[in-house]
Amino acid sequence: MKKIYLQLVLTALSVVSIAQNINLQEDTTTNLYDSRQGSCAMSDIDNDGDLDLIITGADAQLTNRKTTLYSNDGLGNFTEIIGTGLSNWSEGGKIAFADVDGDADQDLLITGRDGSPNYYAHFYLNDGSGNFTPDTTQPFEPSIGGNLEFADIDNDGDLDLFMTGRDNNNLIFSKLYQNDGTGEFSEVTSTPFISEGGSASAFFDMDNDNDLDLILAGKNNNNQKNTTLYENDGAGNFTLVSNTPFENVSNAAIAIDDSDNDGDIDVLINGENEAFETICQLYLNDGTGAFNLLVGTPFIQTAVGTVDFADFDNDNDMDVLVSGSVAGQTFAAHIYENQGMNNFGLVDILETVYLSSTALGDIDNDNDLDAIIIGIAQLSNDIFKPRVYENMLTTLSNGTAVIGLKENIVLYPNPTAGNVNIQTEHTFATSIKIYNLIGELVFSQDNLNPNNQISLQQPSGIYMVVAKSMNSTSTSKLIIK
């Protein structure tokens, strides 16, 4: 009987022109504090050439709140930095790094609340070595439930700030702050932005005129859901764009990038629409700032989560990571490989989460993108544990990608008519979950028998197998004939 080592991902769908594949493996050795209703971000805070980590949030009981900075040793190992002086009032808020004063280091803005609850917006200046000092002179609105976006809106060479959320008076707002070039901000009045909570926003050049326009999604003070687009005139003056195709959503996330490599920026949005349905939709830009919905995408439809564009397999196109709650019932964290021209396929399923936050970057300096995800997990005993996923991508000399698992997962026979044996290289799998290509869980079993043989009564097709052992979690493809 032939055994197929799926770290090579040899399936009937293999195509010669596709030289890469995607597999992210959880590093179970990390020791990061639990985070409930928190946020995470990565940046090189000490200018040593690697990405450090910050995580905010509360513990499982919502009694203690913590903001923790972790130093990276360059290999993806994170150690808590003691005595940072950062406020622990950070539940329900956001994090943003930016060099606001032009001194070549990353400053820090954190929003959130304490247990009272009082809302906060704390800004810190970095001395270049990762030591942060509070700057209490800034006018930023204390808030939760919104978003923070630093960008140069007026082409003057410094970073301005767009901020949304809910303030201490329980009112939803959208505010723009202009940087004077030294890191001092002032609020811009009379902007056209709709006030949005449960919101997401992103700056991008929608029409290739060399200034940053803005897309904004969320719910206003009248509980009306909106997704709006604003055109920048180049001087930081914005005008609402009418008749856009975007579906109105709240509890949203937005990702922007050139998904089809045609030289313009496309938009990916998830959230809850006016019919209280979850969505995840990709809108293609024609190059002039006019957008059209791409129908037939396979993305799982979520809200209260994240969407990210990222080239996980180093093939020069944008793959997609989607997390969040599916219709308020199940959770998800799915990766879709872009096989060119927006031909997406589900290739990896991570620990399912909602109320999630993601941070993507090369944490171990091996030239691929890793992921850190926090949120409320559905299928794990460690519900609020931050999870670090290492990208196992390596490339052979002939250009064939190999998914380098911590332990090889063996499925046989594969393809199968229904019965399949599943084991890891050194230990038997302790649990198996199998999903179809639209992300539905079709099989789950714990405490497998010594032979790890299972019987599947599923239609013919391709399935994703998530196998957990004592030492690792691995994802592989299975074909049912």
Label every PLM stretch briefly.
Residues D48, D52, D103, D107, ...:
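Acidic carboxylate motifs that coordinate Ca2+ or other divalent cations, activating on Asp/Glu
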Residues A401-K481:
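C-terminal outer-membrane/trafficking sorting elements
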